[in-house]
Each structure stands twice: as C-alpha cells, then as structure tokens.
Amino acid sequence: MFPSNNLYPTKYSVSYHPRMKLSKYRLVTQRISRINIMINNNQLRKIIMSKIEEEIKKRRTFAIISHPDAGKTTLTEKFLLYGGAINTAGSVKGKANSKHAVSDWMEIEKERGISVTSSILQFNFDGYCINILDTPGHQDFSEDTYRTLMAADSAVMVIDASKGVEAQTIKLFKVCVMRHIPIFTFINKMDRDSRDPFELLEDIENVLGIKTCPINWPIGSGKSFKGVYDRDEKTVAMFQSISTGGAKAAAETDLGIEDPQLKDAIGEDLYDQLLEEVELLDGASEEFDQELVDKGELSPVFFGSALTTFGIETFLHHFLKMTSSPLPRNSNEGLIDPVSEPFSAFVFKIQANMNKAHRDRIAFMRICSGKFEAGMEVYHVQGNRKQKLLQPQQMMAQDRSVIDEAYAGDVIGVFDPGIFSIGDTICTPGKKFRYEGIPTFAPEHFCRVVQLNTMKRKQFVSGITQIAQEGAIQIFQEFSAGMAEIIVGVVGVLQFDVLKYRLENEYGCEIRLEPLPYNYIRWVKNPEYDLSELHWSSDIKKVKDMKGHPLILFQNEWNIRMLLENQKDLELMEFKKN
C-alpha cells in the first residue's frame, strides 16, 4: 500500500498480487477507500474553513451615531459613493419633489426629511465588505438606535464642528461605552465656521470621558478652510469644494509640510499657525494606541466635510485598518468565536410592512459566527424549535436582494411569521446557547390610546401589538386591567406621530392620544414584591408590560426616591433585557 502520485488531494492505493487472497484484497481496498474518504473530507473541511475565515476577516460592521443634523446621513451616502453602491447622493429635504437620501425609505421619512428607522447598508471597498448600520439621527428615535448599536462592532461618531458634543450624542455614546466597542470620531462641516479644534477635542474628552488622538488636523475653517494635515504622513491634503451631489471627490493634492508651495497655497499666517499647532499636538496630545482604541478608551479623530466629500476617502482607509473584523461575542456558555463556531445570530430589529403591498414582517439578524446558507435549518433557542429561515435577503434601505450566503459580521433579513422577538438567538441545530439580551430602555413620554372606531378593534390590537413587537413603542396596561385601556410609552414624542401614521395608513385605524403626566418608568426588579399591595400617592401609576412584568410610572425623580425610602423591600430597574 502506498500514496498515489496525485499530490492533491492525497490518496492511498493497493496493487493486487497473485499470492494475496481475493477476500483480503477486498478488505484492504475497502479500508483504503474509507481512509481516502476521510482524507478528502478533512481536506475539503479545511478548504471550506479557510474560505469562511477569509470572508469573515474582510467584514467591517459599524454604526454611525450623531445628534440630528450633524451630517450623519450625508457621510453615510458618501461612503456608499466610494463603494460604488450608488452613483449620486440625495439631499434629504422635506418637500415632496425633492430627492431623498438612500437610507431614508419609510413614507413618513420622505415626507419629513428625517430618518425614523435604522437602515442596513452593505458595500465593498478596497478589499473589505462593509456593513453600515445607519441609525436615526433625529432625537425622537433613539431607542431603535440603542438596539442597533448592539449589532455593531464599532461606531463612527459624527460631530458638528460648530457645535461640538450634543445631547443625543451623549446618550448614544453611553451605549457604546456599555459595550466597550471602538469609537471613531469624524468632526464634520469644517468648510463652515467652526469652533477651535482644540476646544472640540477638550469637549469630547470632558463631556464623554474618552481620550482623543487626532489622526489629521484642520487648517482653518469656514471660508478660510484650506485642508487637513496628516500627522502620520506629514503631508497636507488641500481642500477642494465640489458639487454636493456629485460622485467622488477630485484627487486631493498632497503637499509636504516643509514644501515651499504649501506656504504659498495656504498663506503665511495659516502656515505659521499650522506649525505651532502641530508642535503642540506632538507634545501634548495622546499617542495612538491600538489596544486602547479596541477597548473603546481612545477615539481616533478625523476632520473633514461630508457635504463636499473632503476627507472621506482618507477616513475610510484609516478606519478600515484601525477597526477589526468580527470578534467573539458573549453568550451564557462563554465567548462564541466567529470563525471556528458554526452559524449563529441574534435578532436585533423587527420591521413590519416594509413592502405595504405584501404586509410582510422582516426579522433583522446579526450573524455572529460561521456561514449562513439559504435554506439551511437552524435552531430558534427561545422558541425551542427547528426552523428554516425563509426568503433570506440583504437590504439597501428599501431595496432588497435575495442572498444565497452570508458570513459573521453580515446582517440579513428573513421572513418572520410572528415567532421572533428582539434579542432571540438563532444557531445551528445541536447548539443551545443564548447571546446576551438586548436592553429595553425606559420610555420618557406616555399617552393613553383611545380607539375612535371600535368596529376595527381586531385591526387595532393587531397593529399596535405588531408595532410594539418591532420595538418602536412600548405597550403598558393598568396593573389590574386588560387591553381595555392601553398606555403607550416612547423615547421621543415624535414616535407618537409615527404610531398614528402607521395605524391609519397600514391598518386603517384612527386613534386619539391623551398625554399622561408621567416622565419616568421603572421595572420592579424583585419578583416576590406584591405590587397589588402598594398604595401610594396619585403621582405614581402601577402598570404591567406585554409580558406581565410589573412597572411603576412616576411624574418626577423625587417620587422615585420617596417611594424607595418608604418601601425598603422594593427594588427598581431603569431597563430590562429581552
């Protein structure tokens, strides 16, 4: 018996000899056949695993966070331009005859010129497969943003150079810190009058509590904006203003900091100022440390102008090198490795009626490990059942494309017949681990919902329940009542408008919303506490959520403190996990 001369794959063979009994020859050939099958299977498995690892290492999945109007949507579209996913950028406006941003697809978004849902956008650039989780920038749609951040491996924080850190940015930043994910800062709108860049860095460090490391540095701002200095390359990229809706920016002219042409190009005053600021940065600013970036303790900072496409390509190149491919994710059985483990994912978003004509419901899943293949059977852990994921697709805002495969780091949408909930784990049959739950954040505004046409009770209950399951609103009931009286809680008041709009346009139900005087809600942490025995002031209201968990509504923080001082056995939580 000897190896064949076919080097790939390795095979073994045997030659028949007249002295060998035929039965023994057959036995040997059968054993050799089994060995060859095992060798081929092992080699094939290695090839497949190598391909999976190669695809996963190309993935970069990140969210973009910002305060409203900081330029997040514009930056997102310029990324797509460089990736070839779109040809022109649409400017988000409220007029019916205006172009709309690719990432804004719901009718109410197009009418108002805002993003109210999270979009998932995928494109290829420079050998990477990039997944952008484009989140609502409007202050009234932060809860969907919170959940989307749970699916991201890193975040790009967009800051308006004229305003610095704003309220919405602070809220979203806290979620990133909670997850310890890398945070990259893009200070936008440098072509407009802006604050001093040193003030902006100080603002980020003092307000957000994270160290900063400028990768490039602006030369002037507004009408005197001349470009940015690359601290690593020691060159200046000269600013060129182009059409705001155009394709890629013109090639940037790079000049060395000691090049005589640079002083002529930007003027002597700005040149001297640049030299002083670079010297100050080199002596006083934080040094770049990849380990601190990975821990979310140091934020690399970039300056540019998304509207004029200046600094976008430079940012992309740096960002893709500094951020990592999908990392192991926590579960109740420990860390799940994205490469060595088979397919697994978790649901972070549910969206109904993305196609009004089909009344569909899509569950968005972040793949955490392995490879997904269309038609594969998976195990739904929370449902304790095997399930085929039907109609797998990837999204480019409202556009869908059916897919055959996807890898760790990707986000896919699958048809949901009503069995999935936010936070559910999906994995390969034989596995039963659960990924960490996604927090439900406390709403800050509450209304009593009154149905105007009682003949459409069935449609009303179906519609409001489905919208709640998507996570757009939270439904509460009187603690001792049923669905007769429904209280809706939202993170931002504009979500009430979305609720009314969707119930009327998608379910044909008109409602009236009656504001309630409560601003805080807390979940009861200790299940043994009997909320029915609690008799307190009229400043609180006892309710329960859709799963029967007890909660208390408060008018102010003083009510919370007084109740906890009086009820020593009562424990409250600001959020709960699904």
PLM regions: where:
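Intrinsic disorder/low-complexity signal
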Residues: 10-11, 20, 139, 398
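Intrinsically disordered/low-complexity terminal segments and short unstructured peptides
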Residues: 9, 28-31, 168, 234
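Short, positively charged and aromatic/hydrophobic N-terminal segments
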Residues: 8, 15-26, 34-41, 45-46
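Hydrophobic residues within membrane-embedded alpha helices
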Residues: 3-4, 23, 27, 163
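Residue-level detector of bioactive/disordered segments in secreted/extracellular proteins
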Residues: 4, 10, 18, 284-285
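Structural and coupling elements of P-loop NTPases
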Residues: 5, 36-578
